[in-house]
């Protein structure tokens, strides 16, 4: 068609063909890699759940995580409107649910203290069991807006529904060395043993300057990270409140695990 390979038309044809070939390669690679990416995402989630539950050792290999998870963790779906366990929904994904109006609830400005705008109607919680099959901890997912990013984490709670076993943040984009220190194990080490609620059942857990003086509820803030700390506090207020896991945790206190 183009006898002169150096012509403009010939050059354009070569560019078009190369672009088409590259597009096919990229698209094919994305399809081939997707199962691996999904598997890695699930492995990372399991690793973080086991970590906050204290079931990972420094020597634990990735190849061992699935087995440890399967032997110790039971995922259960919770209806956030009632706090009751719900029938399993295979393939449930909270991130997809919030994009579906039929599976989520839009939050009013008053309710949306965590800055998430929409909340899925259901959430997965993770029951941590010992060798006898008894529940020793419950791991709750939570997230909320920080200074620069949405901050995602897990909190492990004792079966009394009021005592923190541990906390971890696994995905956040706060300022390195400042708000980003919410991922620092030294900061997270303040949480075990803290109480979620006050005597009158208000959310008591909070982060603030010098807050550790409150032995029951307070966590010292990271220096220079006031807005990130505010975001952490707002996450606690929402997810431990009535629009979050509050109804479920109330039933946990009442012994729902013995009947669920």
UniProtKB/Swiss-Prot annotation:
<comment type="similarity">
    <text>Belongs to the NqrC family.</text>
</comment>
<keyword id="KW-0830">Ubiquinone</keyword>
<comment type="subunit">
    <text>Composed of six subunits; NqrA, NqrB, NqrC, NqrD, NqrE and NqrF.</text>
</comment>
<dbReference type="InterPro" id="IPR010204">
    <property type="entry name" value="NqrC"/>
</dbReference>
<feature type="transmembrane region" description="Helical">
    <location>
        <begin position="12"/>
        <end position="32"/>
    </location>
</feature>
<protein>
    <recommendedName>
        <fullName>Na(+)-translocating NADH-quinone reductase subunit C</fullName>
        <ecNumber>7.2.1.1</ecNumber>
    </recommendedName>
</protein>
<keyword id="KW-1133">Transmembrane helix</keyword>
<keyword id="KW-1003">Cell membrane</keyword>
<keyword id="KW-0997">Cell inner membrane</keyword>
<dbReference type="GO" id="GO:0006814">
    <property type="term" value="P:sodium ion transport"/>
</dbReference>
<comment type="function">
    <text>NQR complex catalyzes the reduction of ubiquinone-1 to ubiquinol by two successive reactions, coupled with the transport of Na(+) ions from the cytoplasm to the periplasm. NqrA to NqrE are probably involved in the second step, the conversion of ubisemiquinone to ubiquinol.</text>
</comment>
<keyword id="KW-0472">Membrane</keyword>
<dbReference type="InterPro" id="IPR007329">
    <property type="entry name" value="FMN-bd"/>
</dbReference>
<dbReference type="GO" id="GO:0010181">
    <property type="term" value="F:FMN binding"/>
</dbReference>
<keyword id="KW-0813">Transport</keyword>
<keyword id="KW-0739">Sodium transport</keyword>
<keyword id="KW-0288">FMN</keyword>
<keyword id="KW-0812">Transmembrane</keyword>
<dbReference type="GO" id="GO:0005886">
    <property type="term" value="C:plasma membrane"/>
</dbReference>
<dbReference type="Pfam" id="PF04205">
    <property type="entry name" value="FMN_bind"/>
</dbReference>
<keyword id="KW-0520">NAD</keyword>
<dbReference type="GO" id="GO:0016655">
    <property type="term" value="F:oxidoreductase activity, acting on NAD(P)H, quinone or similar compound as acceptor"/>
</dbReference>
<keyword id="KW-0406">Ion transport</keyword>
<keyword id="KW-0915">Sodium</keyword>
<feature type="modified residue" description="FMN phosphoryl threonine">
    <location>
        <position position="226"/>
    </location>
</feature>
<keyword id="KW-1278">Translocase</keyword>
<keyword id="KW-0597">Phosphoprotein</keyword>
<keyword id="KW-0285">Flavoprotein</keyword>
């Amino acid at each position: 068609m183009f006898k002169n390979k150096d012509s403009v038309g010939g050059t354009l044809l070569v560019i078009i063909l190369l672009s088409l070939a590259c597009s096919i390669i990229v698209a094919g690679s994305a399809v081939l890699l997707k199962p691996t990416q999904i598997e890695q995402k699930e492995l990372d989630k399991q690793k973080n759940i086991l970590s906050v539950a204290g079931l990972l050792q420094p020597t634990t290999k990735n190849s061992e995580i699935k087995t440890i998870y399967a032997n110790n963790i039971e995922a259960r779906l919770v209806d956030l409107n009632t706090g009751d366990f719900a029938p399993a929904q295979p393939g449930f994904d909270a991130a997809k649910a919030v994009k579906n109006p039929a599976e989520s609830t839009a939050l009013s400005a008053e309710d949306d203290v965590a800055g998430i705008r929409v909340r899925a109607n259901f959430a997965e919680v993770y029951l941590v069991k010992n060798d006898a099959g008894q529940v020793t901890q419950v791991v709750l997912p939570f997230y909320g807006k920080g200074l620069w990013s949405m901050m995602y984490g897990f909190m492990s709670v004792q079966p009394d529904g009021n005592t923190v076993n541990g906390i971890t943040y696994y995905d956040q984009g706060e300022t390195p060395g400042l708000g980003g220190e919410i991922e620092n194990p030294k900061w997270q080490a303040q949480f075990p043993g803290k109480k979620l609620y006050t005597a009158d059942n208000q959310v008591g857990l909070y982060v603030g300057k010098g807050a550790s003086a409150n032995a029951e509820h307070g966590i010292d803030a990271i220096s220079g990270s006031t807005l990130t700390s505010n975001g952490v506090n707002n996450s606690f207020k929402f997810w431990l409140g009535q629009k979050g896991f509050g109804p479920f945790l109330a039933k946990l206190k009442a012994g729902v695990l013995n009947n669920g």
